[in-house]
């Protein structure tokens, strides 16, 4: 996982058929968060056995629907011989759709602006269908804000001196894959389940004695409450991170944390605009 910087691995049996799947979250929750030593735990003990799979001829819509209904981020794909063909990542699928939406908006906006110029010169009316189309795309591009997806609970925080083991236990207890790190009341970093795997387990550090300040990401980005979900996803995609703290600019307080999976689920219906 560390070498490939992946957070999901498929497990095969002796016949090279899919036997299970495990993720960075599984390692953080089921190993470190459970107080176990990674060297003493086998993959079979923590993996999800016999995961649901899609087939290569499964439609993208059906695969996406399955992932949303089951709460999966990753979905293995098999061919007609039940051999592994690949793995779908719902967030990457969504980014592709988001870029498609952005391109549609850009090209439609150019057409809209051109028609405005024609109207100004000739006094002709713009085709109503074009106006409606551009407005529909614009609304999907702006979309709901981050405030609409927050649950009202503040993000879980730890101090810079908290051990990785304690941090992983807090993740498990609070059903979150990211914690904010505080030093003297100020947010100085963010620590995630992926950090547990790549920066602690893979590096051979002891979670019980390693403090989060050694392995956290310092000075995380923040987003305002009124940022659109689409803008937040673009920010996360460009910054190569999966979690984003949300700040109320009026009170200067951090009021929540969103992750890429939650935002993807919240906006899937927005990329279903026909004929994009």
Predicted regions and their residues:
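Tandem CBS (Cystathionine beta-synthase) repeat/Bateman regulatory domains
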Residues: 1-276
